[in-house]
């Protein structure tokens, strides 16, 4: 355990459930690394992701973005290619990029957007993109003919959330360089989306625990009753 991490843990009472504001302030105070650390939420949900009717997945545009420059690859053809280029996509193409990923193990992108008519080709990448969480999906708005809108939302700070096999959702909500209020705004918008996404099949307590941390900092527990205050 590093010296900076030990110093950070002294600022936190492990038994306390903090208000969102207190937690965001502490997340910034405990971000002591000499780079712009990511501030991330970890939300434990009362769902069993082994069941298809208890999946929690979606996307939301954070009002202040995540602070990360997102590289977008668009797989499209015809008129959609120019539309994607004009909207600010970093890479636009079709089969040539599918082959590049397959043959060269190329991953210089963070999000993939595909038009529905490309999914037959994109389907070949399922085994490669799927485990990395990069496979285009209609639920997250990354399979669409409206590529311009998809790109604009992603560049504006759209984040995807998805419950993992341990029933936890991990989502970045900003950087150490953010003001507390911006983190708080992003936190509230994300929590509203996750609460709305509660599956009808989920029984009992939905928000089991909520914690925030910086890349190198300790977890700070948030009172789940007060997440929308």
Curated annotation (Swiss-Prot):
Gene3D superfamilies: 3.30.190.20, 3.40.50.790. The keyword Ribonucleoprotein applies. One of its GO terms (molecular function) is rRNA binding. GO terms for biological process: regulation of translation; translation. InterPro entries: Ribosom_uL1_bac-type, Ribosomal_uL1, Ribosomal_uL1-like, Ribosomal_uL1/biogenesis, Ribosomal_uL1_3-a/b-sand, Ribosomal_uL1_CS. One of its GO terms (cellular component) is large ribosomal subunit. Keywords: Repressor, Ribonucleoprotein, Ribosomal protein, RNA-binding, rRNA-binding, Translation regulation, tRNA-binding. Signal peptide: none annotated. It comes from the Bacteria. Transmembrane segments: none annotated. Belongs to the universal ribosomal protein uL1 family. Binds directly to 23S rRNA. The L1 stalk is quite mobile in the ribosome, and is involved in E site tRNA release. Part of the 50S ribosomal subunit. This is Large ribosomal subunit protein uL1. The gene is rplA.
């Amino acid at each position: 355990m590093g010296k900076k991490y030990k110093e950070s843990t002294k600022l936190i009472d492990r038994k306390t459930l903090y208000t969102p504001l207190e937690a965001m302030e502490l997340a910034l105070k405990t971000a002591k690394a000499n780079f712009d650390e990511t501030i991330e939420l970890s939300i434990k949900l009362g769902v069993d992701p082994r069941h298809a009717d208890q999946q929690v997945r979606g996307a939301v545009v954070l009002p202040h973005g995540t602070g990360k420059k997102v590289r977008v690859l668009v797989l499209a053809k015809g008129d959609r290619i120019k539309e994607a280029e004009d909207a600010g996509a970093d890479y636009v193409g079709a089969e040539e990029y599918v082959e590049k990923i397959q043959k060269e193990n190329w991953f210089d992108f963070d999000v993939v957007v595909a038009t529905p008519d490309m999914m037959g080709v994109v389907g070949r990448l399922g085994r490669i993109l799927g485990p990395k969480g990069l496979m285009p999906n209609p639920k997250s708005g990354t399979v669409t003919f409206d590529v311009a809108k998809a790109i604009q939302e992603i560049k504006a700070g759209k984040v995807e959330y998805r419950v993992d096999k341990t029933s936890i959702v991990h989502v970045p909500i900003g950087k150490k360089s953010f003001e507390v209020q911006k983190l708080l705004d992003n936190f509230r918008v994300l929590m509203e989306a996750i609460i709305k996404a509660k599956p009808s099949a989920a029984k009992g307590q939905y928000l089991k625990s909520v914690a925030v941390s910086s890349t190198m900092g300790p977890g700070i527990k948030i009172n789940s009753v007060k997440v929308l205050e």
